[in-house]
Amino acid sequence: MEEQVVNAIQIASNPSADQALKAQAFDYVNQLRSDPSGWQICLALFTKTPQHSEVVRHVALEVVNSAAQAGLIDPQALGYVRDGLMAYLRQVYAQETATPDSPGIQNKIAQTITFLFSALYGNGWESFFDDLLSLTYKSPSSTGRDNAPGIVFYLRVINSIHDEIGDVLVSRSRAEQDKANSLKDLIRMRDMQKIAGSWQEILSDWRDGNDIIVEMALKAVGSWVSWIDIGLVVNQTMLDLLFQQLARAQKADLRAGEDKVRDAAVDVFTEIVGKKMKAEDKVDMIIFLNLDTIVSQLSNSPPLHENRFTFKYDTDLAETVAKLVNITVCDIIRALENESTTPESKEKAGGLLQAFLPHILRYFSDEYDEVCSTVIPCVSDLLQYLRKIAKSNPALAAQHSSTLLPILKAIIAKMRYDETSSWGDEDDQADEAEFQELRKRLGVLQQSIAAVNEQLYIDAVSEVVGTTFENLRQSGAQVDWRDLDLALHEMFLFGDIAVKAGSLYTKGVPNNAAAERLVEMMMRMVESDIRSFTHPATQLGYMEICVRYSSFFLNHTQLIPGVLESFLQLIHHPIKKVKTRSWYLFQRLVKQLRAHIGNVAENVVGALGDLLVIRAELASEGSDGDDSDDHEGSVDAVFTSQLYLFEAVGIISSTPTVPTDKQALYAQSVLSPVFVDMEKNLAPAKANDERAVQQIHHDIMALGTLAKGFSDWVPGTHSPASLPAAEVSEVFLQASEATLVALESLKGSFSVRTAARFAFSRLIGVLGSRILPQLPRWIDGLMTQTSSRDEMALFLRLLDQVIFGFKGEIYGILDALLTPFLQRVFSGIADPTTGTDDEIHLAELKREYINFLLAVLNNDLGAVIISERNQPMFDTVITTIEHFAKDVEDYTTAKMAFSLLSKMGSSWGGPDITPDGANGATAQQVALPGFGQFMITRMSPLCWALPATPSFNSKDAQAKQVLAEAGGLQRTIYGKTGMEYIEYLRDRELPSMGMGAELVEEFVGALSRLDLKGFRQFFPSFIQRLSA
């Protein structure tokens, strides 16, 4: 059997073994894991002499571990495993002649021993730590802990036990945490003194002898200190041993591994400070440990002082010391903020804070970002603390300037690209992302400083920006791009305190002192020669700032032509990332400055001509060589950015100063090449040429986007208030026709339908009611047999907006197209669903269908639904609404269905005949013959059908809302039919449901007595009582 197991493990781990044989071996080993007796074979394999190969022993012990964790080994058998492993450990780790296992095997044994500790320390293995400690001696007569292999293994288990029961970062169930707490209590009661003593002895005996042992011992002290008596670590004997290890930091040259010992010693102090205790006790302990002196000595040690700014600088040590500074300062500030801290302790904490300020600045201003990031939490805490003080006593804000200014200067310095950075290099994308994330965090700190002392912040940033632009004025392109980028970045952030309600100005005057200063900065930036901004980062920064502070140009309109010229230079940038971003920023700028741009369209259209050529690329194709895998370089992203140029052209061409005939000319000059391209690609697109279809999609999107630039109209608000002149509309009528021709030829293409739907929504803004005669063709192209439910829902939403915008002109067209249009919607609703997404889209389509009918009714077009042409469809409409009103699986749609039925009732039920009108309907309303009876016999039963469904829960919040809407429908029916409805309820409907006379009278009494709001509240509670 042993031989079989060994063979199986060897085959499974052999990369060159036959795959079928390997699969059999894997299956065999996996069966062994679940075999109740498998662990016994594997334990024997592991401890056997002579030893098997490492992989066999590793897998064998893994099987034992799996069996133990799966509960396949009973407590008595666990004792057998313990005895077997301890005998092995004494044989291998407690004899000088033995060869210890590899670190991998040692970790696996430590894992098994740790599991046995969890299972048996409280129940049968009380001598656990004594047994392990016996391994640390070469012989019983040894006077010190002299057995290195045994010590290493002991410390490995000690650290493993902490991971199992003490590590707060490990997620545990309530039962697991309770067990961990119980084990910690047992250790503290039985063995903690002994364990702590062993650490001292090991650190003393091996302080200069074995760096691995010392490092492991320090890690054990540092990890266990969080849950043991602090006095076991913070005592003179232990501290002397720790200081001895810290002294390694003073060495100029360390042997291999010595740096890890030194860093582990610093980490012990960090863990000591991090231990939970009262604020007063923490302050006293920081003073007792003399941490200020420790940090000072470490900061002045050769690795951090003499070697700073050289390649020998020890960043690991710097980050380790920074962690100690961070946690110490956080605790000092916590003590200062804690209301229960005594005045005496607060005074001590204040002194400590002043002592640690140089340390904060030292590591916060460190040239390595990972070191700086380590102390950001304590800097943030410090600034929040100072902010609270300044808020409670503004007079103190000035006193803190000596603290704030160095921090602010350090923040600004850290926001600068370092000398080794190469902006835009694809190989450095990860570094760039990390730097931008650091800038965000530093920006938050800057805002905190501004909140404490705004004037200090204003002056500091003004100095940086002012100095940079003065240097730029004198030296031009000689200014380091990093300095200019920093100034621009600070200007961008400055708006957080200068901009109010999106503007630098209020009634033409700067908002505040910050806005005044920013206006000065803007003036200096704009007056600089754009050719001095030679680096892509600064060119982007320039454009971003112009867009963010466009209100500056609204108050300095004389500067607009120069800025436009600068942008026109940059939109042809050779670097794609800059070029595509500039297209978006250009559109943003001209949109915000539209009213003040002037008649510059001819120049702009001419300058942009080569960038308006549309070239569709398939995502799988290679690019022109300068693409990257980042988002900006993707095919879709580049075309999306190009669309911003089309919109920008539309905006500039339609400014008030451009004559009407010129507007039409510019629109035609942009559209004509697109029309030609569509005509050229239509035939291959029909033949399913994928690239041609994509080209048509892009062309249609461009047409719609140009129209968007020409009109401010947003679908769903109102009919376009000021349509373009007739000559311009005529040009876009051609665009509409071209889109329809493409759509009619390619309506089977999802991407073409998507583009056409977008274009339709934008063309409305430039065509107004002129688009209405084309509406049947749009519907035919966009509501095809292959249209998804999602597409139908989106188009229904768009039609709602058309109805709202042109309700006075759409009746005839709507009358003609309603029946075929609704038939397509019904077909979409009736199609079977496959999967969750399909069900979501079906629910959305139902709701948009109801919203469409509501839009028709709300805009006084209800007559179209019951016109002679559409009368045959009316019953189907009602049937679908009845179905939705009874759907217990979709309360949202059911609620909307009842709302629609109420609207139908108030529209077609004639004038209210009860004293208290249900819906405030006017007396002039004309009743649809027979609709009153229809409401009573068809609509009223629906109010009871939903709650009668077995799965209906009347206590559900959404269900109550549906019932309230159903109550509203009943109140509407009563408002239109009066006693006729009361008699029907009393004599027929309610008794037929088995309702007793008393309940019937209660219900009809409430219906006739309560107003709409009152009955909407009554009906859900009535149903709830019936369901009880």
From Swiss-Prot:
Keyword Cytoplasm in the entry? The reply is: yes
Under SUPFAM superfamilies, the record lists: ARM repeat
Recorded family membership: Belongs to the exportin family.
Described function: tRNA nucleus export receptor which facilitates tRNA translocation across the nuclear pore complex. Involved in pre-tRNA splicing, probably by affecting the interaction of pre-tRNA with splicing endonuclease.
Q: Where in the cell is it found?
A: Nucleus; Cytoplasm
Q: Which Pfam families match?
A: Exportin-T (PF19282), Xpo1 (PF08389)
The cross-references to InterPro entries, in alphabetical order and at most eight, read: ARM-like, ARM-type_fold, Exportin-1/Importin-b-like, Exportin-T_C, XPOT
Protein name per its UniProtKB record: Exportin-T
Record key words, sorted: Cytoplasm, Nucleus, RNA-binding, Transport, tRNA processing, tRNA-binding
Query: Where primarily located?
Result: nucleus
Q: Which Gene Ontology terms describe the biological processes this protein takes part in?
A: tRNA processing; tRNA re-export from nucleus
Question: Which species is listed as the source?
Answer: Aspergillus terreus (strain NIH 2624 / FGSC A1156)
Citing just one GO molecular function, the answer is: small GTPase binding
Cellular component terms per the entry's GO annotation: cytoplasm; nuclear matrix; nuclear pore
